[in-house]
């Protein structure tokens, strides 16, 4: 059974903001901040849900696979499809200046930064216009080195310190966007 806040993508829905498509999400929050979560491998989903509930922010959990989400009308599950970059494309097409994107996918982060969104890695590291070019270049270099066999292994493990840094960065990002909206 599909819940009211689950959403399948369609061309018509893609042309409208999420609030226009879902009566349960419209007029439920005091701000227009939205968090988009690249959810398939995100280690901080529970932290996002807690911060969003406390600050009354809508969350779109975007994945190619089924992801369990809390029973909360401010949190929606987006089934972006099974294409290789379907979830990334869905997020990148919608992210804007009042949005926060949580992803460890560097190409997606680059697309969202260019769209004006605030982008955070799960370890709390912000991606910015100043840093994204170098971050993308390093990612591409590491991919080439791994494929040639010169480097084996992956990134270091996720730590409690990373989780704490993420919580702080997310809270600061939401409050910064809300302050900017209230002065506009």
Regions found by a protein language model. Give the residues of each.
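N-terminal amphipathic/basic-hydrophobic helices that include classical n-h-c signal peptides
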Residues: 1-26
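Nuclease catalytic cores that cleave nucleic-acid phosphodiester bonds
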Residues: 21-184
């Amino acid at each position: 059974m599909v819940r009211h806040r689950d959403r399948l993508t369609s061309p018509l829905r893609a042309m409208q903001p999420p609030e226009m498509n879902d009566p349960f999400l419209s007029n439920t929050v005091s701000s227009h901040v939205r968090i988009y979560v690249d959810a398939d491998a995100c280690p901080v989903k529970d932290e996002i849900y807690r911060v969003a509930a406390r600050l009354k922010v809508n969350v779109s959990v975007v994945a190619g696979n089924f992801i369990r989400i809390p029973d909360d009308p401010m949190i929606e599950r987006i089934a972006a499809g099974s294409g290789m970059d379907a979830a990334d494309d869905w997020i990148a097409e919608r992210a804007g200046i009042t949005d926060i994107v949580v992803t460890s996918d560097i190409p997606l982060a680059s697309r969202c930064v260019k769209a004006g969104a605030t982008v955070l890695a799960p370890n709390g590291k912000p991606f910015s216009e100043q840093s994204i070019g170098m971050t993308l270049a390093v990612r591409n270099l590491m991919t080439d080195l791994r494929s040639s066999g010169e480097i084996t292994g992956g990134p270091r493990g996720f730590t409690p310190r990373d989780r704490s840094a993420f919580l702080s960065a997310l809270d600061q990002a939401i409050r910064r966007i809300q302050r900017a909206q209230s002065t506009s």
